[in-house]
Swiss-Prot record:
GO terms for cellular component: cytoplasm; ribonucleoprotein complex; ribosome. InterPro entries: Ribosomal_bL33, Ribosomal_bL33_CS, Ribosomal_bL33_sf, Ribosomal_zn-bd. Keywords: Ribonucleoprotein, Ribosomal protein. Pfam families: Ribosomal_L33. This is Large ribosomal subunit protein bL33. GO terms for biological process: translation. Gene3D superfamilies: Ribosomal protein L33 (2.20.28.120). The keyword Ribonucleoprotein applies. It comes from Prochlorococcus marinus (strain MIT 9303). SUPFAM superfamilies: Zn-binding ribosomal proteins. Belongs to the bacterial ribosomal protein bL33 family. GO terms for molecular function: structural constituent of ribosome.
Length: 66
């Protein structure tokens, strides 16, 4: 029998500063992305977490894109 997938889904977090600003004041070119899981029942809205961006070389807010 197949197992139920459950309520946890895989999401992608993307740096807000890398996306909005061009390559000004950056260590290198690119957009920082992290993948993580979230519980759909507990967190229905889009997730926003402060994480380290290796392109900006500082901690920035990362927002859920998918």
């Amino acid at each position: 029998m197949a197992k139920n997938k459950g309520v946890r889904i895989v999401i992608t977090l993307e740096c807000n500063e890398c996306r909005s600003n061009p390559a000004i004041d950056k260590r290198s070119h690119g957009v920082s992305r992290y993948t993580t899981e979230k519980n759909r029942r507990n967190t229905t809205e889009r997730l926003e977490i402060k994480k380290f961006c290796r392109y900006c070389n500082k901690s920035t807010t990362h927002k859920e894109i998918k």
